[in-house]
């Protein structure tokens, strides 16, 4: 009969009949003999029971085995399937040996060790001949749906790039799950469940980067936490790292938060290679990058008009921030279209013009930063009505790229259909094939470096991950394995070395963090504001702020919520430029007469033709019409033919100028509209981004009415960031738009053109942010270590989250954000940011002190302690 083995701090032993107990300094774990070692109880050092109220348990482990000669055939087993389970005492814990697990598994040995601060979990698995271990989920443990007396303060957080706080996870039901994988979205290898008084901590202490995921999922009787490792191991597989579990406690003055779990994780993380040097100490990063730069992004439209970039730099940036280095991200430089790969060259508008722009900007303190699309290879792009494609690279890919592309489990090539390819598709090159590493360096990075680019991001290789590759002819194991982390590490190292041979100040980057590569990159793409959780949790920046600067990848001009969070979180100030910046009074609506044409392609300056929405391709067409127009020399013509879905051309009109802040003025949107034919009603639609207020429309007239002036009067609602104008046509149709105008309605009913100063709330906020980040607050905001922030009590405001694919979710966000920092010399500061355009009262509870503050609209305040 199995003995109950109790390990206390002194590792004393006791015997009983039904269970085994392992105790660490923060957590006691009980394993149930009758359930073949399932975790039946978890108790913190202060006596808080974390387990479910019932006797329910989860099997201690579950495994997936796959045939070595047929990757499509797998079997799954779990601890409860074992014919036998023997528990033995070891010097520092327990060893549980399982046999009789079916056709694929010979034996499993689980170890559970105590005595230190954490309980440590290890496992080895022996596969039978002809089988390989593919997935190992261990340990699995069931926690209570309710910590304490109420679930209302229960929270779950994992170390995900787009993580966040899930409140009351026990109420989410059995279909809820919250997991992330590394390489991939898991930026730090821990998960936590906590309430105000107690917390549970689960982590993988893996310094090598084995492929794994971890997190929680709903179950009938509780919440299951586990770690799942992915590999393809025949014979015996030994987990090469410890999984650890522990507990932590809070007090009424200092309640538990996810920061406590992150602090536990950081004790281990700072001992790893990726934390060898703080960012300021790194000699491989150029001095200007260590001088707290700001950042800006220019799109394809700007690059087609290089003088507009020069004008912005000279008239705005150099006048406002003459001493601040500037990272200049370029989007849309690719030859064929945005994110179309790998036929990048010549770039937009041409190599010579682009290189001169890069050189000129560098002389003014600007550093070029293109983001080529990683390992993706576009095989087809922009599907036409007749089924052909605007760009078809299948023949070249078959000859050059396909032998090195990712292969699915069934032996077929991996194919993806992202929306930006407009009905086309792409392959993914395998980073575990050395050819891919060399191809990326030789054919993508070096040509860009020779054009003068100092910085390059490996975009779309999220967290250093790409799809599982089962190619038998590639020099890596099937499926997943630590070879994936090794391969991307080699990519970053060789990329930096080859770029640096041409450009001594080379900086490399990749999309979304992975802690294993912190020390190999000089700036980090970050997207925590895109979390689907109602409450953001910037786990990566909290852990590694002093080691690597982050920027919010997709900034939204005028989005006060994002700006306030990013500023309080110590992220790089990232500007969204407008052509009116630095020009003095100008019209907010650009090119409403459709007279300014884009260079090198069909289109109008200031207007964007959308490829689609929510995965639906909008494949109608836009034309520059020189014949049919109301006035001037051109009008825009929109057509939707038979078999086509829709066409939309749109523009966001900035509403962050002070003229729009009163809410009392009346404005009129009007346009000359004409219809050739129309199968169903359509209109020029408009809405207010950042506000729940309704929008409106300018309906297209009947064909027999000819040109007709159509208008709508509006009041700008509070909180509105942009007026989005959408010329949208569904069904078979031909329509024209000309003379679109945005004017103010005066008291006598007449109108006058709106002129903005270019000195609105957004400009003021960004100026203050840049000044603090680069100047007075740099010791904290740019280089400081984040520490557990004060608890902030403030109001909330409605907010609509918008996600990739166009889905929306309404929620409430705080009116202010707060974080705390410690400088390299030990000075502490608290940063509080107002996320609204009106004054707000907030209360901070900081180290036993209560402090009430009144924040001015959009204020960023540093409280030096």
Region locations from a protein language model:
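Polysaccharide-binding surfaces and accessory modules of carbohydrate-active proteins
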Residues: 21-27, 46-98, 102, 114-115, ...
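Active-site-proximal substrate-binding groove within the catalytic cores of carbohydrate-active enzymes
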Residues: 233-242, 484-586, 753-829, 835-848
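Active-site-adjacent "subsite" loops/lids of carbohydrate-active enzymes
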Residues: 367-450, 530-544
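C-terminal beta-strand-rich structural cap/linker in extracellular carbohydrate-active enzymes
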Residues: 851-865
């Amino acid at each position: 009969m199995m003995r109950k083995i109790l390990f206390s701090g002194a590792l004393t032993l006791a015997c009983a009949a039904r269970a085994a107990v392992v105790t660490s300094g923060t957590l006691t774990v009980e394993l149930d003999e009758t359930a073949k070692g399932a975790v039946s109880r978890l108790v913190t050092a202060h006596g808080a029971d974390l387990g479910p109220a019932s006797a329910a348990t989860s099997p201690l482990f579950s495994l997936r085995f796959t045939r070595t000669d047929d990757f499509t055939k797998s079997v799954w087993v779990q601890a409860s399937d074992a014919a036998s389970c023997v528990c033995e005492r070891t010097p520092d814990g327990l060893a549980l040996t399982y046999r009789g697990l079916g056709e694929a598994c010979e034996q499993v040995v689980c170890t559970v060790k105590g005595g230190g601060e954490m309980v440590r979990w290890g496992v080895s698995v022996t596969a039978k001949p002809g089988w390989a271990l593919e997935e190992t989920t261990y340990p699995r443990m069931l926690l209570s749906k309710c910590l304490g007396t109420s679930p209302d303060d229960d929270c779950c957080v994992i170390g995900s790039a787009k993580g966040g706080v899930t409140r009351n996870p026990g109420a989410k039901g059995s279909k809820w799950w919250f997991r992330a994988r590394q390489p991939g979205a898991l930026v730090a290898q821990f998960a936590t469940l906590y309430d105000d008084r107690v917390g549970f901590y689960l982590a993988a202490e893996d310094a090598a980067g084995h492929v794994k995921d971890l997190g929680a999922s709903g179950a009938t009787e509780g919440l299951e936490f586990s770690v799942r490792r992915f590999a393809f191991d025949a014979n015996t597989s030994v987990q090469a790292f410890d999984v650890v579990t522990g507990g932590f406690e809070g007090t009424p003055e200092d309640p538990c938060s996810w920061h406590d779990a992150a602090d536990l994780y950081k004790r281990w993380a700072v001992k790893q290679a990726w934390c060898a040097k703080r960012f300021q100490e790194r000699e491989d990063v150029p001095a200007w990058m260590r001088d707290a730069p700001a950042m800006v992004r220019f799109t394809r439209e700007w690059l087609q008009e290089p003088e507009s970039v020069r004008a912005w730099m000279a008239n705005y940036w150099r006048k406002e921030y003459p001493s601040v280095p500037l990272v200049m991200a370029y989007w849309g430089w690719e030859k064929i279209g945005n994110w179309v790969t790998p036929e990048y060259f010549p770039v937009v508008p041409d190599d010579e013009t682009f290189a001169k722009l890069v050189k000129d900007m560098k002389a003014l303190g600007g550093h070029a930063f293109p983001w080529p699309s990683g390992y993706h290879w576009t095989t087809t792009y922009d599907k036409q009505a007749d089924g052909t494609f605007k760009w078809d690279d299948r023949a070249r890919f078959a000859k050059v790229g396909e032998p090195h592309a990712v292969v699915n489990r069934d032996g077929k090539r991996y194919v993806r259909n992202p929306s930006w390819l407009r009905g086309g598709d792409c392959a993914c090159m395998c980073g575990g094939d050395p050819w891919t590493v060399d191809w990326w360096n030789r054919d993508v990075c070096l040509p860009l470096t020779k054009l003068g680019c100092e910085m390059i991001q490996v975009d779309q290789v999220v967290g250093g991950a790409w799809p599982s590759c089962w190619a038998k002819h590639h020099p890596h194991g099937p499926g997943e394995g630590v070879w994936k982390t090794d391969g991307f590490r080699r990519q970053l190292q060789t990329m930096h070395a080859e770029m640096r041979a041409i450009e001594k100040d080379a900086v490399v980057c990749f999309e979304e963090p992975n802690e294993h590569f912190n020390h190999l990159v000089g700036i980090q793409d970050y997207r925590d504001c895109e979390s689907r959780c109602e409450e953001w949790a910037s786990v990566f920046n909290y852990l590694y702020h002093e080691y690597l600067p982050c920027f919010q990848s997709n900034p939204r001009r005028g989005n006060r919520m994002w700006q306030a969070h990013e500023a309080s979180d110590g992220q790089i100030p990232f500007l969204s430029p407008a052509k009116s910046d630095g020009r003095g009074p100008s019209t907010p609506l650009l090119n409403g007469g459709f007279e300014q044409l884009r260079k090198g392609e069909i289109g109008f300056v200031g207007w964007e033709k959308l490829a689609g929405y929510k995965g639906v391709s909008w494949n109608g067409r836009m034309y520059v019409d020189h014949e049919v127009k109301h006035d001037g020399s051109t009008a825009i013509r929109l057509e939707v033919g038979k078999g086509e879905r829709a066409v939309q051309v749109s523009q966001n009109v900035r509403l962050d100028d002070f003229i729009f802040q009163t809410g009392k003025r009346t404005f009129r949107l009007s346009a000359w509209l004409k219809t050739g034919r129309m199968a169903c009603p359509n209109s020029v639609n408009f809405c207010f981004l950042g506000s729940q207020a309704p929008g409106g429309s300018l309906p297209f007239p009947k064909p027999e009415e000819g040109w007709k002036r159509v208008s709508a009067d509006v009041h700008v609602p509070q909180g509105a960031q942009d007026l989005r104008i959408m010329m949208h046509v569904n069904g078979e149709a031909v329509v024209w738009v000309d003379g679109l105008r945005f004017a103010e309605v005066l008291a006598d009913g007449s109108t006058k053109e709106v002129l903005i100063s270019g000195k609105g709330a957004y400009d003021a906020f960004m100026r203050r942010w840049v000044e603090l980040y680069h100047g007075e607050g740099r010791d904290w905001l740019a280089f400081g270590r984040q520490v557990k922030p004060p608890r902030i009590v403030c109001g909330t405001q409605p907010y609509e989250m918008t996600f990739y694919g166009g889905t929306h979710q309404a929620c409430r966000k705080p009116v202010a954000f707060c974080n705390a920092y410690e400088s390299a010399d030990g000075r502490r500061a608290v940063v509080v940011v107002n996320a609204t355009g009106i004054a707000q009262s907030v209360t901070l509870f900081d180290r036993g002190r209560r402090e009430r503050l009144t924040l001015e609209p959009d204020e960023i305040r540093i409280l030096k302690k």
